[in-house]
Amino acid sequence: MKPGMVRGRMVQIVVLGIGASWIVPVAAQNRAEGKLDVDGKPVAITQVYAYAKEGFFDKKKQDVVVLLCDAPVPAPVMRDTFAYKDLIATGKVHCVRQTIDADKQVINYDVGHQRFGSLGENGGSTEHVFEAQTFDGKTIAGRARTKSPQKSFKDVPYTYDITFSAAIEPKK
């Protein structure tokens, strides 16, 4: 091999290594463990994503959306409600989404499972809670759960209890 080719390869390897070292800590920081139980059938939740958005009740503050799923969700789908609902309807993922305000209150929830149909199970309820461990604008960690067994609009019983930690992606 020519010295110039070797040097070029070495530069590529070093650049890739540096890039990977920046990505790995963020990915390693995101973790989820728990379950979503729909109609007596448990689903293990292993993925978590979090992103900031403009506050619904106070535009000067930010809300954080936490998406907890049993399978990876492509980045473009994470913030796209219609694409997200398509994944749910086809049974490719099962998810719990909570929108949490600056006061650490769940102001909206969505439980995505094909058993609920295309609309899913969503709304606002004090029965869906977030118990914060970390909530500093950069990281969100804690427990997302239902206080008691719930019933969907179609009378399908469900509960969830998930602990998680995730880096918060900035507003877009």
Where are these regions (language model features)?
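N-terminal secretory signal peptides that target proteins for export/translocation
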Residues: 1-8
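Bacterial N-terminal signal peptides
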Residues: 12-22
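Boundary at the C-terminal end of the N-terminal hydrophobic targeting segment
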Residues: 26-28
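N-terminal targeting signals for Sec/Tat export/insertion, comprising classic cleavable signal peptides
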Residues: 37-61
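A mature extracytoplasmic/lumenal domain signature
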Residues: 40-42, 49, 83, 88, ...
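Amphipathic hydrophobic-ligand
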Residues: 41-45, 121-127, 156-163
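Surface-exposed helix/loop patches within compact recognition domains
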Residues: 56-134
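C-terminal or internal capping secondary-structure element at the end of a domain, subdomain, or sheet
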Residues: 134-172
